Regions:
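Intrinsically disordered, low-complexity segments enriched in serine/proline and basic residues
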Residues: 2-16, 20-24, 31-34
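Ampiphathic alpha-helical segments that act as solvent-exposed interaction surfaces
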Residues: 29, 38, 71, 75-80, ...
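Terminal, regulation- and interaction-focused segments at domain boundaries
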Residues: 29-81
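Amphipathic, interaction-prone secondary-structure segments
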Residues: 80-136, 454, 531-532, 536-545
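Non-transmembrane, interaction-prone alpha-helical and coil segments associated with secretion
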Residues: 82, 162-169, 176-187, 191-243, ...
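Intrinsically disordered, low-complexity regulatory segments enriched in Ser/Thr/Pro
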Residues: 103, 111-172, 227, 247, ...
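Secondary-structure-rich domain cores
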Residues: 105, 595-601
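Long, charged low-complexity terminal regions
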Residues: 271-573
């Protein structure tokens, strides 16, 4: 995933249109949102106002930075929708050489709609492998296409899709993606299957993926169809649905390529992945600072993502324990423990690595044993976890949400957000100050007048085309800053208002101080309880990994492995059903798979 290429002063529309990869959103389609959906989540939260977690806790950076995938992550909701609506999927074309170079086509039939995922594969030198947006070569390049792919379209895709940003698409193309093979494991897996062996769990058990994606584009980029182009009953008329269908099939390609190359190398001796391994690998992904501007520029989207989680958590916390519920929760705790116990002991600072989560889960199991037979046991378990710290509380949140049985039709609707807002220039200074105190009173806790609060500014690098933080004492912005300094802008706006007459219209303030226009616009747009992380992106203490992890968890990613303070690697769809397994008996308990334990010769 990569950065939104937006600069300071861009309109909200431009910010949405220019946003890259999985961050591409759907806000351009406001006119198509059902009339009740814009306020539906707020109504649901209001009905639970005495039970939901306050924003003062839920939006703390350390809490967001401990989030884990849940039942309402986008990967999970996509597959549940596929099962509920009777989707079928499979491979319809494969033309690869012995090294896995060539083309493959998968199809998904979703009711009356058919979609094709067309992938072109090659090999490049290991030195050319990079997760950066400036890469110009990839081993895998694919496109999700509306309908079947005829010869003419396939010929065009062969030219345009491998070009990615340099290519040009049309509205038949719904999503564009690319990536590379795992340098460490692809060849090893081919060799083992070619020799008639399953992989050695000690060699690849903590790998988690065969291919690693580096971007998913959609929503009108390069001429593709925009979210506004989907009618209301379209299967992809849900945020991120098209991208996650593409990601699921991208993951399938990894299995198919390895098994094809193994057969080419081993002939009759070759075997495919057995039952223990055939779901274990997911799709790798790497993400950097590009996630941060997206989260900071879309407060209502962030509110929806957090609000859905908080709504479901509130329901479970007050739930009466059914006879089988306790056993179900114990099963999820045990499953999580087994999954993380077989993971790595790598340094994942500032997060806990897999091995460190094992004693945490042992404590959770013990705590559940103490409260299970008492009054309001789910609430008691959560309150205990909150006192243990964010890593424990958010692990327990993820586990408790597995007990929630919300209506997916409703939840799909709740993720649709109307981001339009407009400021009233006749509003008085007193009215604006009251709104600022109500919505951003927490800014006073951030020491925003101190020098460390304004140490950095954000810029899109000329060399890498990615967001970077620059030291203000070493490089002046000169109008190139990416406007993610929300806390500072609103704080300074408030300071200016202190010197103005209470009855003065805010338009007069902006006439004298036009630099505060964006602050006023943000104040108006930030009208939801969960829209603002309680943090300052320009401070020396700011840790981008925290908001990144929250966003990745909402996507459905796990196995967070930071490489520094600004970027990390993750895994998606690990344990998920394969294309051929999709059917009415497909269950939603595929997450947290156990590492295969045997190596059959």
């Amino acid at each position: 995933m990569h950065p939104p290429r937006v600069g300071g002063g861009c309109s909200a529309w431009q910010a949405r249109v220019e946003t890259l990869p999985l961050e591409r959103t759907y806000a351009a389609a406001v006119s198509l949102i059902p009339p009740t959906s814009a306020d539906a989540l707020q109504a649901e939260l209001a009905a639970r106002s005495g039970r939901i977690r306050p924003a003062a806790y839920a939006m703390r950076p350390e809490v967001l930075g401990a989030a884990r995938l849940s039942r309402y992550s986008f990967s999970r909701t996509m597959l549940r929708r596929a099962v509920a609506d009777g989707w079928t999927a499979g491979r319809v074309h494969q033309d690869l050489d012995a090294e896995g170079r060539g083309e493959t086509i998968y199809v998904v039939d979703a009711g009356t709609q058919r979609f094709s995922f067309v992938v072109f594969t090659t090999t490049i030198d290991e030195s050319a492998h990079t997760d950066r947006v400036i890469a110009d070569r990839w081993e895998v390049a694919g496109a999700l296409v509306d309908g079947d792919v005829d010869d003419d379209l396939l010929a065009r895709l062969r030219i345009e899709v491998p070009e990615q940003e340099s290519g040009r698409m049309d509205p038949r193309i719904l999503s564009l993606t690319r990536g590379n093979r795992s340098v460490r494991f692809f060849g090893y897996l081919v060799d083992e299957l070619a020799a008639g062996r399953q992989p050695d769990p000690d060699q690849v058990g903590d790998a988690g993926y065969i291919l690693r994606s580096t971007a998913f584009y959609a929503n009108g980029k390069f001429g593709m169809r925009s979210f506004a182009g989907y009618p209301g009953d379209h299967p992809f008329r849900v945020p991120y649905r098209a991208q996650f269908v593409a990601a699921w099939m991208f993951r399938e390609l990894g299995y198919d390529m390895v098994e094809h190359c193994a057969r080419a190398k081993g002939g009759d001796n070759a075997v495919g992945f057995d039952g223990e391994w055939c779901r274990y690998f997911g799709l790798g992904n790497a993400t950097g600072l590009g996630l941060v501007p997206y989260a900071l520029k879309h407060p209502r989207v962030l509110d929806a993502w957090v609000g859905v989680r908080e709504m479901a958590l509130a329901d479970v916390r007050e739930r009466v324990v059914a006879p089988t519920d306790g056993a179900v929760l114990r099963g999820w705790i045990a499953k999580a423990r087994e999954h993380f116990a077989s993971g790595s002991n790598d340094d994942c600072t500032p997060f806990l690595n897999s091995q460190a989560l094992v004693p945490l889960l042992d404590d959770v199991a013990e705590a559940w044993g103490r409260v299970a037979d008492g009054a309001d046991p789910y609430d008691a378990l959560y309150l205990w976890a909150e006192n243990q710290g964010p890593e424990t509380s958010e692990m327990v949140v993820s586990l408790l949400l597995e007990l929630h049985d919300g209506d997916d039709d409703l939840f799909d609707l709740l993720f649709l957000v109307d981001e339009h807002s407009s400021a009233d220039p006749t509003a008085t200074v007193a009215e604006v100050r009251a709104k600022l105190d109500e919505r951003f009173g927490w800014l006073g806790e951030l020491n925003l007048d101190e020098p460390p609060a304004d140490a950095f500014w954000w810029v899109v690098s000329d060399n890498t085309e990615e967001p970077r933080r620059a030291r203000r004492d070493r490089l002046a912005p000169e109008g190139r800053d990416v406007a993610v300094d929300v806390a500072l802008r609103l704080w300074r706006f408030g300071r200016t208002l202190e010197d103005r007459h209470a009855d003065e219209p805010v338009a007069a303030v902006l006439a004298d101080h036009p630099e505060h226009r964006m602050a006023l616009e943000r104040l108006v747009a930030s009208d939801r309880r969960y829209g603002e992380p309680r943090d300052n992106t320009c401070a020396t203490s700011y840790l981008p990994l925290q908001i990144q992890r929250f966003q990745l968890a909402q996507y459905g990613m796990d196995e967070f492995k930071p490489k520094d303070t600004d970027w990390l690697r993750v895994t998606l769809f690990q344990g998920a059903p394969r294309l051929a397994e999709l059917g009415p008996d497909t269950t939603d308990d595929w997450v947290l798979p156990a590492r295969p334990t045997s190596r059959k010769e």
